[in-house]
Amino acid sequence: MEDYVYYNELYDLYGSLLTEKQRQYFEDYYFNNLSFSEMAEDYDISRNATFKQVHIVMEKLDELESKLELYKKRCELLKISSRIEDEEIKERLENLI
């Protein structure tokens, strides 16, 4: 479950940097809850090919995060935000995140 949330967060941050096909594979697997077999049938490719394509997308998201670290920075800002007592500043920071 932790990976599911993590990759959804990465997709929110970096999804626009993926190709249309990569977004389609990711969304079918993560958002539409299609199995690799169902995806294989839809795309008229092997189950193994769909498995590989989904993992290529996950690797791409990991690569983008390792270079840009937007998820890491967002998590750090959320931690800082939770310790801020001034509600106005806290709200402004959370709006930026």
Model segments located where?
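Short, Lys/Arg-enriched N-terminal segment that forms or immediately precedes the first helix
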Residues: 3-15
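C-terminal flanking helix
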Residues: 58-65
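Key DNA-contact positions within bacterial/archaeal DNA-binding proteins
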Residues: 47-48
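Intrinsically disordered, low-complexity basic tails/linkers immediately adjacent to helix-turn-helix/homeobox/MYB/SANT
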Residues: 69-90
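Hydrophobic positions on the alpha-helical face of helix-turn-helix-like DNA-binding modules
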Residues: 38-40
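Residues within the DNA-recognition helix of helix-turn-helix
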Residues: 53-56
